[in-house]
Amino acid sequence: MAALVVGVVLGGCHSNAQTAQSVDPLSEYHGLYTPSNTEAFQASMHTNHPDYDWGVWGHNLAKLVKDGATDDMYAIVDGKRSHKQFCFSSQSLYNKVREYVLDQYGWGTADYSERISIMPMDNKTACTCDDCTARGNTSTNATPAVTAFVERLAEEFPRHKFFTSAYHTTNTPPTTSLAANVGTFVSSIKLPMRVDFTKTEGYNEFVQNVKAWRKQCSRIYVWDYERNYDDYLSPFPCLLAMQARFKLYRDLQVQGVFVNGSGDDYSAFDDMQTYVLALLLDNPDTDVHESIARYYREHYPQTADLLTTYYWGLEQRAQSTNHLLPLYGSMQEMCESYLDVKEFVSFRSQLDKASKLTVGDERKRLNALLTALAYTQLEMYRTGLLAKDEETIGEMREILKGHSELKGMNNRDESGHSIDDYLKKWE
């Protein structure tokens, strides 16, 4: 799952040293990987960002090791050495990580610590060398060796916090309790993206997994998702679904959440959604509709009513139908779930006309949104959801070409497919 790889970071920030036992639910980490979660936004809304507040982030050991890797750092898979996975019993690997932590962040202090992620490479292989097998590894379970590696670091660097992941070969919890400065990310990928997910198998599996890890690990973060990763430019009404998820995490005593959005890439309605998500992480009982309306009144004074009415209508439709919101979905799937073609075309047209009466920051924001929505309408034409209209298609193409003048609007999805390449398909 590529969504667990994004944002590979080597860097770090200063954070207050804190034990997991002192942390209230959802109070320790509010990570938002979205383009609107800027440094200024983080300061005003108390959010976090992986580029700024992790010493090592994601599946990043390969970047850390770099050219200093030796053969014994890599796993034995099916009896052969594989450079696609690490051996977490390797003394050389431990020495390399230890050296990096000490060189970059030192021992930490009572007031300074780093969050450091120690995760296997993002695949389903596990090392079964003699040492890893002796620790309890199997071909499908790397938890024993990985947690032993992390525990060793945590003991040597008690001021820093070390995180692993409940994902792929480390999904199974350890059999012994982990230190207070060790945490784990539990992926919510199997928790269906819909407003009411409580009657699904994925819900039961997720809850059981969090509770199982909770027995052995006192610091639990959730790695969550809030975007259609196949289409950043089209509307994605995730806020009521995210509110339901955050309420669940609070009930499960989860201390932190990382919400994986579109990273640095522009996505439709992201500025408003990032604002509301930040409020919901502070208080999952926040009134979503009022928060949306308040944001638009402040930042889009001339078009606030139009934007609020349309977007809230999408959220209400997603709630009333309880249809699955596709994390990887086509235009047809989005229209089956929440988009109404005629309603969308009418909204985009009205917004375009209204935008011409705006000035300053509102005009700039609307220009970006209308550019993104031109892609949505082109996709409706391309997939046959709209009858071909060469004049309007030409107009949408010209609008979308303006993406090159806008910050962050180069890619249309997680895989990095460019808008320019998409436009070439229309030539």
Locate predicted features:
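Structured mid-domain segments that build the active-site/substrate or prosthetic-cofactor binding neighborhood
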Residues: S92-N95, N204-D305, T309
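C-terminal motif of bacterial Sec signal peptides marking the signal peptidase cleavage site
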Residues: G11-G12
